[in-house]
């Protein structure tokens, strides 16, 4: 049945929310939903995870993958921190590399790391006389251009910085263009989301809408995606959806703000759940029967969060009947 309800049911299955993933399936899921992010407002250094999707402790698992340098850190979506498989670094460098605009401080640090690295920020401060507030933005500029690499393999503060090509000698950050990289990653995301709009993909990857829309149109021209409603479906899923009714996910899950389901369509969702009260914001979104239909409003703190209200987009009677179920999820 080619309906949004069946699409949603298949999406929940592909996200491993209907049935949790073992290690091999989890690795494929993580790859398709990369760059992986930490839980929003997490403790410093916590490994990335995909909440409620693994049949094991994926925070511990991804921490181990970080220590083995299977997962590595970079600055990806809008300069934000994320973690990708080291084997995928060239692809994501092509997707996110920003043109390098040298400054006096960035060139000084680049030369110093090349000569003396790996170095931590404290050593750079001591050797250059620069302040941390001068060093950090210069390192971020170099990191976004994939010229240096921050080796965060555990939760410690004392992290070494290397020249990128020293850590990844076989990776050419300029080999893959952004347009080509989008043609590779968008089918992965579409496979997991099943139904994907250009706006969803733009929010997920944090890239210009024009670039994302052009890539999706090209994938449709190639027959990899097909147009449906306001977005696209993977072409291979159309007969599957027409022939099979998938079991829907029933229940309520609380999703943190970096969850992949939240990141798709995040811009519109932020507007819809904007609180008129100063100091109140979304702390979690509520996935109700496979669709985001509510949010927990409050204020983040170190320690227990403030909880102000629970907003729901449900009929009043249904919300009343499911009150305890919703509160348990929160």
Language-model region placement:
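Long, charged, low-complexity, helical-prone intrinsically disordered regions
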Residues: 1-330
